[in-house]
From Swiss-Prot:
This three-finger toxin inhibits ASIC channels. It acts as a gating modifier toxin by decreasing the apparent proton sensitivity of activation and by slightly increasing the apparent proton sensitivity for inactivation. It binds more tightly to the closed state and to a much lesser extent the inactivated/desensitized state of ASIC1a isoform of ASIC1. It interacts directly with the outside surface of the thumb domain of chicken ASIC1a (ASIC1a), but does not insert into the acidic pocket as suggested previously. Belongs to the three-finger toxin family. Short-chain subfamily. Mambalgin sub-subfamily. The keyword Disulfide bond applies. This is Mambalgin-2.
Amino acid sequence: LKCFQHGKVVTCHRDMKFCYHNTGMPFRNLKLILQGCSSSCSETENNKCCSTDRCNK
């Protein structure tokens, strides 16, 4: 799962996660657009939470 950073680099606080929104199609190249930082990021089919801005958990 690859993440493509949009815009400038964003940093989050230690207790927060980078929240991405999945704009890709299933079983194809997924593009995750950075939505912002959140302390309560819930992962769903269309959302992904990462501990870094590059989605490297």
